[in-house]
């Protein structure tokens, strides 16, 4: 599939889609560095239409994921932050960037630095829940928020957060 997508038959109109599909195939094959390079190259192309614009947003999400898997958390966060508030992927980005902040928190040496990253993670989840409370990922985001409050030793807030999840799913 990767060879076919890179072939000369791919016209300019489909170039961004082909590069994106190639990067996804590379990532699925475990070739994360190649995928990152393909995604980075994709951002050098001009956006010609609405489809290219959506591919661009998907590219930012994919870059965030690939760089996260490569352990380059700063690059992951930078990629996620390219997604705008009006994007239909905004809630997904906030959920994923939260995990990047958690990962960065776990890499910190001091408790103060860990807490600073956890606060960023909490803020991202809170923005997600306020901006789109009906998002399909809102229940998972609430559970994540509860866990973040546990890590910050905000036990009462964590309990209330978990209770709100239970109440939402009670028959």
Where are these regions (language model features)?
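Acidic, polar-rich low-complexity tracts and alpha-helical solenoid repeat scaffolds
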Residues: 1-171
């Amino acid at each position: 599939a990767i060879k076919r997508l890179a072939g000369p038959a791919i016209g300019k109109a489909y170039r961004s889609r082909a590069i994106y599909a190639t990067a996804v195939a590379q990532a699925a094959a475990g070739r994360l560095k190649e995928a990152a390079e393909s995604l980075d190259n994709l951002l050098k192309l001009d956006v010609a239409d609405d489809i290219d614009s959506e591919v661009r947003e998907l590219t930012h999400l994919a870059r965030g994921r690939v760089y996260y898997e490569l352990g380059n958390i700063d690059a992951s966060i930078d990629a996620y932050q390219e997604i705008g508030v009006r994007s239909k992927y905004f809630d997904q980005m906030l959920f994923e960037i939260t995990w990047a902040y958690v990962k960065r928190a776990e890499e910190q040496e001091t408790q103060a630095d860990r807490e600073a990253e956890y606060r960023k993670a909490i803020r991202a989840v809170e923005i997600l829940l306020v901006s789109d409370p009906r998002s399909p990922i809102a229940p998972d985001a609430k559970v994540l928020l509860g866990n973040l409050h546990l890590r910050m030793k905000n036990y009462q807030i964590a309990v209330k957060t978990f209770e709100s999840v239970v109440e939402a799913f009670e028959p």
